[in-house]
Amino acid sequence: MSLTPNHRPVLVVDYGAQYAQLIARRVREAGIYSEVIPHTATPQEIQEKNPVALVLSGGPSSVYAEDAPGIDPDILKLGLPVFGICYGFQAMTHALGGKVAATGKREYGRTDLEVKGGVLHDGLELSHKVWMSHGDAVSEAPEGFTVTASSEAAPVAAFENVEAKMAGVQYHPEVLHSPHGQQVLTRFLTEIAGLEQNWTAANIAEELVEKIREQVGPEGRAICGLSGGVDSAVAAALVQRAIGDRLTCVFVDHGLLRAGEREQVEKDFVAATGAKLVTVDERKAFLDKLAGVTEPEAKRKAIGAEFIRSFERAVAGVLEDSPEGSTVDFLVQGTLYPDVVESGGGAGTANIKSHHNVGGLPDDVEFELVEPLRLLFKDEVRAVGRELGLPEVIVARQPFPGPGLGIRIIGEVTEERLETLRHADLIARTELTAAGLDGIIWQCPVVLLADVRSVGVQGDGRTYGHPIVLRPVSSEDAMTADWTRLPYEVLERISTRITNEVADVNRVVLDVTSKPPGTIEWE
């Protein structure tokens, strides 16, 4: 199941931009529901979604390239408000009869925008910074459009036709590097397109509960695996709100957990929801399946497959205590929108890696999936959790991958290596919390390079220990991320404690890679 809201969407047409999903998120931040569709969508397919407006995303192509994705002119004749961004701005111009030129001047990064009036930039400084990323530029606006901004390399950096409810900008209003970008996007949606801002956490929760009731039916029973994270907790809380005690939550202790995690789930979630919880100990089964497995994708698949097998065993146990003839047909998953995107869930997207909530399920899975969060971003999930009354200890928890520490050990997963990583992870989390840094870090994976040995000096002799990698990142939604600039004294305390207290570790290193190009998790 995925959320099909009672809201007509703003459709973000994806031209291959890394920020297409971020645009959709910004539209929702403006209080309006949005979805992403591929640029290959036909006018008929667009009409079937009954949208209220279109936003054309950026993309890497030139409108003059032989295989450049364009926009069907018939789409622009549907009578919908249209907003073009970067490449979408140029494609829109081209389709409407304006001119796009290869000026030979490129603009990448922060750029001065010169405002010449109009609705989009009304009240903003006449010269302010925006984030540009383009080679070609619009040299002449289509007939009926007013040029409202320019830059050094883009004579037409923004235009609008208020009567036709169409506008566009050459820069990227969706990124934080364009300080007034959210205001500009909201102006288009509300003042030019005339849309109502009615997308809130309260109505998201209400609609989700109703959709779950429709899918599961009046007698259907569901099972939900709790990981201890916010996604599974909110998904379970929604389903329980919808079907009550026909939901059984199962916490699989697969041995890949962080220190104290099992106890936290058994205490915090049950106290907050009163849900039925069954805990099963499957540590040996998972370690047996992972024995000798070192390839990251193989590990993910093995963990996903064994998780379902563990679930089936748990279901059998639940059914033993149920009325004769009862079955459990529905499996609740906390899949999020970025999960689907990263797993190649849309046309034109590359399959980066098999996501732990999407691609690891075996073909013979016996459950019908209930995925109430599938079209939500992380901030929306937290908002729904608060709306449902879940405590901050759950909704504010940093993300943790479904495969757990299994994908934070580079190499074979063994009990000894898990204990090493678990100890190092606890030290890092304890020090970050003590320093008051939890609020600025999206998450901080701690990674054990188990197949690497580095030379060190500890005590009176040389050692050959494993390196530990700290990967603190800051992000809004996990689609893009930057490494967090932690205070040196905090890094020093973490490093000193890990090398002093964790056996067989003699080096701590800091990962300073952004996403892209690197993903947040190492595997």
Swiss-Prot record:
Cellular component annotations (GO), alphabetically ordered: cytosol
PROSITE patterns: GATASE_TYPE_1, GMPS_ATP_PPASE
Alphabetized GO MF terms: ATP binding; GMP synthase activity
Domain of life per record: Bacteria
Enzyme Commission number(s) from the entry: 6.3.5.2
NCBIfam families recorded: guaA_Cterm (TIGR00884), guaA_Nterm (TIGR00888), PRK00074.1 (NF000848)
Listed name of the protein: GMP synthase [glutamine-hydrolyzing]
Organism: Corynebacterium efficiens (strain DSM 44549 / YS-314 / AJ 12310 / JCM 11189 / NBRC 100395)
Gene: guaA
